Amino acid sequence: MKLVIKVTGKFFDDQGDKTPLSSAIRSLVQEGHRVALVTGGGTTARKYISLGRSLNLNEASLDLLGIWVARLNAFLMALSMPDLAYSRIPESLEQFLEYWGHGKVVVVGGFQPGQSTAAVSALVAEAISADYLVMVTTVEGVFDSDPKKNPNAKFLPRVTTTELKSILENTQSVKAGTYELLDPMAMKIVERSRIKVIVTSVDKIGKLTRIIKGEETASIVEPV
């Protein structure tokens, strides 16, 4: 299968061991999958965006700051897999497709201002006709409300994009560093190309192969 793995930037926020991610990618490749990895910017990106705001930078410039941090995280992961990953980080979809043609794992940060890394991951999934877009987040899947605010939030093993849009309504923002699980642009891409999305937690990175096989709990978002 062709897989796009989007990992929240919060995975890179602490100094903890990052080998579970590279090990999971390695396992997927060994099982015969083609893999693209997309990394977010996390707290470091938001820190630079905040510094940029203090200097009165515009939203496009703030986006660029976040993109460069996401690319740094991508470069870190590419360096950690020298035998598997293409050594350069693409800065556009055209570059991504060029690197993808070499047959290796391609690791991506951001492309251009106005796009979240969620949108980038959806674009990449669309461009390679991915079987799944796997969103690795800070929660174990999709809930009917924010589980961090509502302890009684209900876990949803299957949800449509229409239902997910309703859940996320009024929580989206287009400002740099404030994107949600799937922002409007990412949602449109998922719907127009009917990309199946799996949502899981960073705590389960080591179980990605089982998640892909449906042997581990995760949420599946069906495009409609």
Curated annotation (Swiss-Prot):
Keywords: ATP-binding, Cytoplasm, Kinase, Nucleotide-binding, Pyrimidine biosynthesis, Transferase. It comes from the Archaea. Its main location: cytoplasm. One of its GO terms (biological process) is UDP biosynthetic process. One of its GO terms (cellular component) is cytoplasm. GO terms for molecular function: ATP binding; UMP kinase activity. The gene is pyrH. SUPFAM superfamilies: Carbamate kinase-like (SSF53633). This is Uridylate kinase. Catalyzes the reversible phosphorylation of UMP to UDP. Pathway: Pyrimidine metabolism; CTP biosynthesis via de novo pathway; UDP from UMP (UMPK route): step 1/1. It comes from Metallosphaera sedula (strain ATCC 51363 / DSM 5348 / JCM 9185 / NBRC 15509 / TH2). The keyword Kinase applies.
